[in-house]
Amino acid sequence: MATEIEVHFPGDVQVEAHIRGFVISTDQPEKSGGNNSAPSPFELFTSSIATCAGYFAVKFCRARNIDTAGMSLKMAYDWDKESKRYPKMSVELTLPEGFPEKYRGAIIKAMDQCVVKKHILEAPEFEISAVYSSEAPNR
Protein backbone atom coordinates (compact mmCIF):
# COMPACT_ATOMS: atom_id res chain seq x y z
CA MET A 1 0.00 0.00 0.00
CA ALA A 2 1.29 3.44 -0.90
CA THR A 3 2.18 5.93 1.81
CA GLU A 4 -0.13 8.93 1.63
CA ILE A 5 0.14 12.44 2.98
CA GLU A 6 -3.06 14.47 3.29
CA VAL A 7 -2.51 18.22 2.96
CA HIS A 8 -4.83 20.86 4.45
CA PHE A 9 -4.89 24.64 4.11
CA PRO A 10 -5.80 26.18 7.51
CA GLY A 11 -5.49 29.81 6.39
CA ASP A 12 -3.26 32.47 4.90
CA VAL A 13 -0.31 30.65 3.28
CA GLN A 14 -0.08 28.04 6.03
CA VAL A 15 -0.10 24.44 4.86
CA GLU A 16 -0.41 21.30 7.01
CA ALA A 17 0.68 17.79 6.12
CA HIS A 18 -1.03 14.90 7.92
CA ILE A 19 0.92 11.65 8.00
CA ARG A 20 0.77 8.65 10.36
CA GLY A 21 -1.32 10.61 12.86
CA PHE A 22 1.11 13.54 12.97
CA VAL A 23 0.45 17.08 11.77
CA ILE A 24 3.38 18.94 10.24
CA SER A 25 2.68 22.66 9.97
CA THR A 26 4.40 25.00 7.54
CA ASP A 27 4.27 28.72 6.93
CA GLN A 28 6.34 31.30 5.13
CA PRO A 29 8.47 34.10 6.53
CA GLU A 30 6.74 37.48 6.65
CA LYS A 31 8.82 38.70 3.67
CA SER A 32 7.18 35.92 1.62
CA GLY A 33 3.64 36.75 2.71
CA GLY A 34 3.42 34.42 5.69
CA ASN A 35 3.09 34.87 9.44
CA ASN A 36 6.35 33.07 10.27
CA SER A 37 4.35 30.74 12.55
CA ALA A 38 6.16 27.56 11.44
CA PRO A 39 9.13 26.51 9.34
CA SER A 40 8.83 26.87 5.59
CA PRO A 41 8.53 23.73 3.47
CA PHE A 42 12.14 24.15 2.34
CA GLU A 43 13.31 24.45 5.94
CA LEU A 44 11.49 21.19 6.73
CA PHE A 45 13.13 19.60 3.70
CA THR A 46 16.63 20.59 4.83
CA SER A 47 15.80 19.66 8.43
CA SER A 48 14.80 16.20 7.23
CA ILE A 49 18.28 15.76 5.72
CA ALA A 50 19.97 16.91 8.94
CA THR A 51 17.79 14.80 11.24
CA CYS A 52 18.20 11.78 8.98
CA ALA A 53 22.00 12.09 9.19
CA GLY A 54 21.63 12.52 12.95
CA TYR A 55 19.53 9.37 13.20
CA PHE A 56 22.24 7.33 11.48
CA ALA A 57 24.92 8.85 13.74
CA VAL A 58 22.94 7.91 16.86
CA LYS A 59 22.22 4.44 15.50
CA PHE A 60 25.95 3.97 14.81
CA CYS A 61 26.87 4.98 18.36
CA ARG A 62 24.17 2.84 19.99
CA ALA A 63 25.34 -0.24 18.08
CA ARG A 64 28.79 0.25 19.63
CA ASN A 65 27.67 1.41 23.10
CA ILE A 66 29.20 4.84 22.52
CA ASP A 67 27.72 7.57 24.72
CA THR A 68 26.15 10.34 22.60
CA ALA A 69 26.14 12.95 25.39
CA GLY A 70 27.68 16.09 23.93
CA MET A 71 27.27 14.94 20.33
CA SER A 72 25.65 17.49 18.05
CA LEU A 73 25.08 18.05 14.37
CA LYS A 74 24.64 21.15 12.28
CA MET A 75 23.84 21.65 8.64
CA ALA A 76 24.69 24.79 6.71
CA TYR A 77 23.80 25.98 3.23
CA ASP A 78 24.23 29.30 1.40
CA TRP A 79 22.00 30.78 -1.30
CA ASP A 80 23.60 31.38 -4.70
CA LYS A 81 21.93 34.43 -6.27
CA GLU A 82 23.15 33.58 -9.76
CA SER A 83 21.80 30.02 -9.90
CA LYS A 84 18.91 30.83 -7.50
CA ARG A 85 19.48 27.70 -5.48
CA TYR A 86 21.55 26.21 -2.67
CA PRO A 87 24.43 24.57 -4.56
CA LYS A 88 26.04 22.94 -1.51
CA MET A 89 24.82 21.65 1.82
CA SER A 90 27.33 20.79 4.53
CA VAL A 91 26.64 18.49 7.47
CA GLU A 92 29.05 18.60 10.40
CA LEU A 93 28.88 16.19 13.31
CA THR A 94 30.56 17.21 16.56
CA LEU A 95 31.72 13.98 18.13
CA PRO A 96 31.17 13.30 21.84
CA GLU A 97 34.07 13.25 24.29
CA GLY A 98 35.88 9.95 24.18
CA PHE A 99 34.64 9.03 20.70
CA PRO A 100 37.14 6.49 19.32
CA GLU A 101 39.23 7.93 16.48
CA LYS A 102 39.09 4.56 14.70
CA TYR A 103 35.35 5.14 14.08
CA ARG A 104 35.55 8.70 12.66
CA GLY A 105 35.39 7.58 9.01
CA ALA A 106 32.84 4.89 9.77
CA ILE A 107 30.36 7.29 11.38
CA ILE A 108 30.63 9.56 8.33
CA LYS A 109 29.80 6.55 6.13
CA ALA A 110 26.88 5.75 8.44
CA MET A 111 25.48 9.29 8.11
CA ASP A 112 25.91 9.00 4.35
CA GLN A 113 23.29 6.22 4.41
CA CYS A 114 20.54 8.81 4.95
CA VAL A 115 17.53 7.74 2.89
CA VAL A 116 16.42 11.35 2.39
CA LYS A 117 19.75 12.27 0.80
CA LYS A 118 19.67 9.11 -1.32
CA HIS A 119 16.30 10.19 -2.72
CA ILE A 120 17.83 13.50 -3.75
CA LEU A 121 20.81 11.87 -5.43
CA GLU A 122 18.60 9.30 -7.16
CA ALA A 123 15.50 11.40 -7.65
CA PRO A 124 12.14 9.65 -7.94
CA GLU A 125 9.78 10.44 -10.77
CA PHE A 126 7.28 13.12 -9.79
CA GLU A 127 3.73 12.97 -11.13
CA ILE A 128 1.58 16.03 -10.44
CA SER A 129 -2.11 16.23 -11.35
CA ALA A 130 -5.24 18.19 -10.48
CA VAL A 131 -8.74 16.74 -10.14
CA TYR A 132 -12.12 18.13 -9.16
CA SER A 133 -13.54 16.82 -5.88
CA SER A 134 -16.18 14.89 -7.83
CA GLU A 135 -13.37 13.01 -9.60
CA ALA A 136 -11.27 12.28 -6.51
CA PRO A 137 -11.32 8.76 -5.09
CA ASN A 138 -13.30 8.36 -1.87
CA ARG A 139 -11.09 8.78 1.18
Regions found by a protein language model. Give the residues of each.
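Extended beta-strand/beta-hairpin segments
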Residues: 1-47, 57-139
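Alpha-helical metal-binding/catalytic segments enriched in His/Glu/Asp
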Residues: 52-53
